[in-house]
Amino acid sequence: MPELGIVIVSHSADIAKGLVSLIREVAPDIPLTATGGLEDGGLGSSFDHVQVAVDSQPANRLLAFYDLGSARMNLEMVEEFSDKKILIQQVPLIEGAYAASALLQAGASEVEILSQIN
């Protein structure tokens, strides 16, 4: 089981999907899950979708990246119910998730990744 994974939470399914595509170009092998939008396909953040993204992660420690405040709130609520350690990052979504993913793919440690993106 991998030690560290990446979770992306966006208000837009298109942003989440596009960011995963971008990341997979530089980090094809890392544990990566993403969610965006609401059940009806609209914009927003869903507790249930975030919970699925976290629960489907094979890693037990997760670097979580989000776009707007309610996405962070949903990450915080999911963290309360999860056995996984979720490290919510307050960095720009695309740049932060991309850099962290590339570093993780290259074998950087959690400490090294956090020092580079913060």
Predicted regions and their residues:
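N-terminal loops that bind phosphate or other acidic moieties
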Residues: M1-N118
